[in-house]
Amino acid sequence: VTHLIAHILKSAGKKIILGGNIRGVSGLQLLKKIKNAKMAVFELDSWQLQGFGDSKISPCISVFTTFFPDHMGYYKGNIKKYFSDKAHIFKYHKNKDLLIVGKQVLPFIQKWGGKIKSKIVIPKEKLPKSWKFNLPGMHNEYNAMLAVEVARTLCISDKKTRRALESFTSLPGRLQFLRKVNGIKVYNDNSSTTPDATIVALQAVGDVKARKVVLIIGGDNKFLDMSELINEIPKFCSKVVLFKERGTDLIRDKIFSFRNKGIAVYEEEGLKSTVKRAFSIAKRGETILYSPAFFSFGKHFKNEFDRGDQFVKIVKNLR
């Protein structure tokens, strides 16, 4: 959503700064530049929002997209504390400020005990039918609608917004279409580090009637409930390749039990072997989806970005 908003604003000729939880961009480096720009578009995680809470400030326009359990190791399983940090994005709003809320997160906000002073906007679920948007999945279309509401608030015409959205392409690691090899589509969804994110990815590129997804999954333990994802995998997947790691160990037995449902299941050590296995078993017309659902930390990668870079390199070198 952050990149969508930034793309719309830039396309409309606005001078902006993009920062926050963005790869290769240090928020500290941007502080001197912000005064020279008219707008700052920041993606803020719960840790960054802790700082907003310490300073008792919230952005004048806030977009709260979704809320799912994450970072439960750090929060010691306290989902209320996690939401409390996230809530700093709107907690210190004034009457003139704006909170744009995704439909999924609305019940959590309604249960929140604090008073919200700003105006709340809940976008429509779909873009106008005549608009062409290239990213797969209903969640991406809804993300686009969140960005549309920001543009409208800033008096950017729908005509300019439409033109910007129709030129937007997928971001690295976020349901990024890499290539088609021998009739097999390959998607890099490396940024999906939670079970909920992987479920959304399966729904975006999969089909419950066809079951043509070859899923690559696994990583380090994030202390999240994997039960819903385990229930969803058989609906979309013909094959699953497990990437051996500490988190993967927790779901191995249940994933291997899918063999009783006619789903082929394998486990490999190292990303290169895992990807090669997926390509060796995938058939023409199927889709290989790399959506880990776990942390990147462990012995194989420096960080999440390194994991994604390695996957892209391996896929590009395949013949």
Predicted regions and their residues:
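ATP-dependent carboxylate-amine ligase
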Residues: 152-157, 163, 167-171, 177-319
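Residue-level signal for inorganic ion chemistry
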Residues: 21, 43, 65, 82, ...
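Short glycine/serine- and small hydrophobic-enriched flexible loop segments
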Residues: 29-32, 148-153, 203
